[in-house]
From Swiss-Prot:
UniProt-annotated location(s): Cytoplasm, Cytoskeleton, Cilium axoneme; Cytoplasm, Cytoskeleton, Flagellum axoneme; Cytoplasm; Cytoplasm, Cytoskeleton
Biased composition (Polar residues): 38-55
Disordered: annotated segments: 35-61, 149-168
GO biological process, one term: flagellated sperm motility
Keyword check for Repressor: no
Entry-linked InterPro entries: CFAP276 (IPR022179)
Top-rank taxon: Eukaryota
Keywords: Cell projection, Cilium, Cytoplasm, Cytoskeleton, Flagellum
Physiological role: Microtubule inner protein (MIP) part of the dynein-decorated doublet microtubules (DMTs) in cilia axoneme, which is required for motile cilia beating. May play an important role for the maintenance of myelin-axon integrity. May affect intracellular Ca(2+) homeostasis.
Name of the protein in question: Cilia- and flagella-associated protein 276
Length: 168
């Protein structure tokens, strides 16, 4: 009986080192130490053990100066009642982090002591505030999105005159 012939036969690889290059040389490790030992040496151990400002800010810690609600947020702003009277809301709600350039500075965490920060430099030229010269009426339908639904009904749906629901 005849043996069935393989239609997709793979030729046997002979002399792999001659045709494909030295396979064993390419599989050699390029590093002296295995990864689990190299991670315990500098610079990798220093990089993995030293937290960045972002990773430290994600850690759980208690700071009594953090605003707990909207009132505390507003009280923590840089507002002086003597010099800041009759300012508008955008000028009142300025926080120290907003107006200072803190790029590359280290964040102070509980238990760490740093020198006192310099006074913030505020310039009215850097604040851009636009006020619409024409007061728009809230009852005006001009510019509103046309829709058969009204918010006054339950679930935002209104009925047609014949009792059916609007559909899109």
């Amino acid at each position: 009986m005849l043996q069935p012939q393989e239609t997709f036969s793979n030729p046997a690889l002979r002399d792999e080192d001659k045709h494909l290059g030295n396979l064993w040389a390419s599989k050699k490790s390029l590093y002296k130490n295995p990864a689990h030992l190299a991670q315990q040496q500098d610079p990798w151990s220093r990089l993995s053990s030293t937290p960045t400002a972002t990773s430290r800010s994600r850690d759980t810690f208690f700071d009594s100066k953090i605003p707990k609600d909207d009132l505390d947020f507003r009280l923590a702003t840089l507002y002086n009642h003597h010099t800041g009277a009759f300012k508008n809301k955008t000028e009142i709600l300025l926080h120290q982090e907003t107006i200072e350039d803190i790029q590359g500075t280290k964040i102070q965490f509980p238990g760490e002591c740093f020198h006192a920060p310099s006074a913030p430099i505020t310039s009215r030229t850097t604040i851009r505030h636009w006020i619409n010269p024409k007061k728009e009426s809230i009852h005006s339908i001009q510019g509103s999105i046309v829709s058969p639904h009204t918010a006054a009904t339950n679930g935002g749906y209104s009925r047609k005159n014949d009792g059916g629901f609007f559909s899109t």
